[in-house]
Amino acid sequence: SHDWSSGGGFDTSLEVLPDSRVTPKGGERNLTAGEVAMARSVFGDGLDYDAVKVHRGGYWLFFGFQDEDTAVTPNGEMYFPGKHFKEDYSLESVGDQGWFIHEMTHVWQYQLGYWVKSIRGPRPNMSYAYTLDAGKQFCDFNMEAQGNICEDYYLAVIRGAQRLMRASKYRSNPMAPELLKTTLRDFLQNQSDSSNLPKVTE
């Protein structure tokens, strides 16, 4: 489960009133303006944001397979279990925003041609862990580690919430923000470059 500190509200230059709509169970919605601004802080122009849907209900909802605390993004769209679905993640806690960025990483992977579903599906024990090494590039990490790296970059560098990083070993490391920037260097220079996609599956 996700137990995060409070303190959300991604600051954008747009003055947008909160959307009063409520997405029904099993329904979907587009990204909000705040969510797009939040995602752009990591993925820049490397995504077609208009194509992204956020579902209230898991991808495996009707099969009973999905854990109630797990979101999945197998096809370029995000599926959050009901209790974790939000109408606008940019207005939620910084921790929830980080989770959103993790799932957006899988959207980015999918849109650039990575076979998210077929690669992740048969590997239920794929590691989310990562170690920041000057000799490793973003493409040297598997798809879930990439998700955590983007999430931690957002938390530590964009939001200044290093204490919430997924990789607990870096939460008090003063070098963590710079290490993240170094690992993401090629990605941040061109988020549309498919050479940044995972080259490993372990």
Please state what every model-predicted region is.
Residues G26-E77:
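Auxiliary, metal-adjacent structural segments of Zn-dependent hydrolase domains
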